[in-house]
Amino acid sequence: MLYYLLKYINDVFDPPGFGVIEFLTFRASAAAITALLISLMAGPWFIRYLKGRFIEPVKEEAPPEHKKKKELPTMGGILIIFSIEVSVFLWAKFDDPHVWLVMLAIFWMGLIGFIDDYRKVVLKIKGGLSARYKLLGQISLGLVIGLYTWFDPAFAVLLSKTTIPFIKQLSIDYGIFYIPIVIFIITAVSNSVNLTDGLDGLASGTTAIVVSALGAFSYLAGNAVYADYLKIPFIPGGGEIAVVCMAIVMACVGFLWFNSNPAEIIMGDTGSLALGSAVAVIALLIKQELLLPVLAGVFVLEALSVSMQVLYFKLTKKLSGQGRRIFLMAPLHHHFQLKGWAEQKIVIRFWIISILFFLTSLMTLKLR
């Protein structure tokens, strides 16, 4: 909205300084500041409103340290989503389909997460929304994203093609498998972020790091000169995603102000599913989805720990009659909790690992 207003003023009256609205870096920075301020200013009121209304009880199977915590208001993801949506609405270009697809993903999976949280904390239905309905929501989003990008001429340049990290000379054409792969990536990443949201600040901080890198890739991919120099796919209009990325990053940072240990609020599935789907869709749109195992390495490790734990337990139970575990508890962050690591230490160390993955991902820009 502000973009079009300021652009109109600049075109009609040509006041000094208003031309800066055309610069992507300015609008990305403005979106970041707006998202941060909304989070910080609305946060205290929002927390007061949620207290006594939407409290998530501590799970019975939670580690002992978790059981010592007071029950916290959940659905904090609403604050994150609101901050993102408003800042993007103010500073991004509405006519860019990349922006709307990411916004659709955030709203869609945020709604699925909200229903799940509402069933758990208000209706007191154990487990919230059943896994099959969550999966249905993820598959539906994947279908919409996949079909839209398949048929919209704006995405016809690359469509089902993508690049291989570290080997830029090679590319892959998914062909008829494009839509199933889109569905798989959206489902896998959104679930991975959801599994990571188990300690104060872990999911929000890690997401901010991951999306920062995606923002850099988006900016470079949307510039024909930079894309050609770095040998990455040129995505016409893809630079506009950087505005969305910066809004996501600072909405997470603003939320982290209240979510850091000891947390005053948690994001719930409302936030984790929305953020996970955003990460997946952004990576797909800028053709960096194959980089996610590196860039989103912490999310991948968390998801793998759960898969390995379940499979190993079932296999050993079938072979010996008694199930065994690889980890003390899954996801991985709970394993370290039970080993005696302080929660703050786990979170900070996982952030450090995320930064290492972030830097490794940026290194791929110069590798031929």
UniProtKB/Swiss-Prot annotation:
Q: What class of enzyme is it?
A: transferase
Enzyme Commission (EC) number: 2.7.8.13
Chief location of this protein?
A: membrane
Mention one GO biological process in which this protein takes part, according to its record.
regulation of cell shape
Q: Which reaction does it catalyse?
A: UDP-N-acetyl-alpha-D-muramoyl-L-alanyl-gamma-D-glutamyl-meso-2,6-diaminopimeloyl-D-alanyl-D-alanine + di-trans,octa-cis-undecaprenyl phosphate = di-trans,octa-cis-undecaprenyl diphospho-N-acetyl-alpha-D-muramoyl-L-alanyl-D-glutamyl-meso-2,6-diaminopimeloyl-D-alanyl-D-alanine + UMP
Q: Which GO terms describe its molecular function?
A: metal ion binding; phospho-N-acetylmuramoyl-pentapeptide-transferase activity; UDP-N-acetylmuramoyl-L-alanyl-D-glutamyl-meso-2,6-diaminopimelyl-D-alanyl-D-alanine:undecaprenyl-phosphate transferase activity
The cellular location(s) given in this protein's UniProt record come to: Cell inner membrane
In terms of Pfam families, this protein maps to: Glycos_transf_4
Query: Which keywords belong to this entry?
Result: Cell cycle, Cell division, Cell inner membrane, Cell membrane, Cell shape, Cell wall biogenesis/degradation, Magnesium, Membrane, Metal-binding, Peptidoglycan synthesis, Transferase, Transmembrane, Transmembrane helix
**According to Swiss-Prot or TrEMBL, what is its membrane topology?**
Multi-pass membrane protein
| Required co-factors | Mg(2+)
Instruction: Check the record and name the InterPro entries matching this protein.
Output: Glycosyl_transferase_4, PNAcMuramoyl-5peptid_Trfase, PNAcMuramoyl-5peptid_Trfase_CS
Sequence intervals crossing the membrane: 30-50, 72-92, 98-118, 139-159, 170-190, 201-221, 238-258, 264-286, 345-365
Name one cellular component (GO) term: plasma membrane
Question: According to its UniProt record, which protein family does this protein belong to?
Answer: Belongs to the glycosyltransferase 4 family. MraY subfamily.
Write down what this protein is called. Phospho-N-acetylmuramoyl-pentapeptide-transferase
According to its UniProt entry, this protein's organism is Chlorobium phaeobacteroides (strain DSM 266 / SMG 266 / 2430)
